[in-house]
Amino acid sequence: MGSIASPSLSSSSQLLTITVEFTGGLESIFNNTRKHTLSIPATYPSPSTGEPEPTSVASLVHYLIENVMEDTRQELFVVDGAVRPGILVLINDADWELEGEEKYQIQQGDNILFVSTLHGG
């Protein structure tokens, strides 16, 4: 696997260890691996200002595309930079709509589950 750029970490940066899972066929675009234990930066550059801000689900999605997904078919996971409609997201077994959706700030030990509810026929 080649080197992939990620947000630079300073010596004072902290990492969050989280579990990310993919089901419903999504695992096929994430190296055919259902469960990933990741250490991600606790802060991520803001898309608007470039300043560090606490890592959110939106930042995690970008991180996953840049650092975990090897498949080139990003459109199966995201549309216009957001999680594709038809993909259920659970944060610690709760619907992400209850947690603030893409604005939810990732916490140490979180379990984020992406479930595709779309199936070909």
UniProtKB/Swiss-Prot annotation:
Pathways involved: tRNA modification; 5-methoxycarbonylmethyl-2-thiouridine-tRNA biosynthesis
Compartments where located: Cytoplasm
CDD domains in the record: Ubl_Urm1
SUPFAM superfamilies: MoaD/ThiS
Main location: cytoplasm
Superkingdom field: Eukaryota
InterPro entries in UniProt: Beta-grasp_dom_sf, Mopterin_synth/thiamin_S_b, Urm1
PTM-bearing positions, type 1-thioglycine: 121
Modification after translation, per record: C-terminal thiocarboxylation occurs in 2 steps, it is first acyl-adenylated (-COAMP) via the hesA/moeB/thiF part of UBA4, then thiocarboxylated (-COSH) via the rhodanese domain of UBA4.
UniProt entry keywords in alphabetical sequence: Cytoplasm, Isopeptide bond, tRNA processing, Ubl conjugation pathway
Family: Belongs to the URM1 family.
Identification of the protein by name: Ubiquitin-related modifier 1
Originating organism: Ajellomyces capsulatus (strain NAm1 / WU24)
